[in-house]
């Protein structure tokens, strides 16, 4: 892990509980089995790059040898033109754009986060999903509210039923991502 960090001094934030003064982070390896989860002191963080900032980095980079997942992100940008909610790539595409280190493969999927502290109208959620659902490789869209995260696909397929809500301390089933508060047993201090 130390060798990997010396080669690529970037980590990703993990949505997990962390001790006071620490942030849960992940170190990427060359393969999924070479990933490591740990904690970093908040004071050790030198730069924070939000997913929505990465769209700008993509637009200013040269397109010489973009992998299929990066090309897929360009298609999503076209299809979501005008979306005012902050959004951007996470996962391997986000890591690659933020760090400059090649980690995507032709088979990597595209993970996207949409920040939605306010309720997204169901018709907007459907429209966003319909614009990307047939793209390949697969596009996984996670919506992040102020309390939890959830899969856009699950939300649009079952808008009036319970869905899996992800909290920093774990997941549980709920029916209102914007109204649910983390239960005491899952609350992060």
Listing of model-derived features with the role each one plays in the protein:
Residues 1-92, 125, 129-137, 141:
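Helical scaffold of the NTase/Pol beta-like nucleotidyltransferase catalytic core
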Residues 43-50, 162-179:
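Mature, function-bearing regions of proteins
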Residues 77-110, 114-120:
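Active-site nucleotide-donor binding segment shared across nucleotidyl transfer reactions
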Residues 104, 128-131, 158:
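Short, solvent-exposed amphipathic alpha-helical segments in soluble enzyme
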Residues 121-123, 150:
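Short, charged/polar "capping" segments at the starts of alpha-helices
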Residues 133-170:
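Conserved catalytic core of two-metal-ion nucleotidyltransferases
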Residues 179-180, 185-188:
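Polyanionic, low-complexity intrinsically disordered segments
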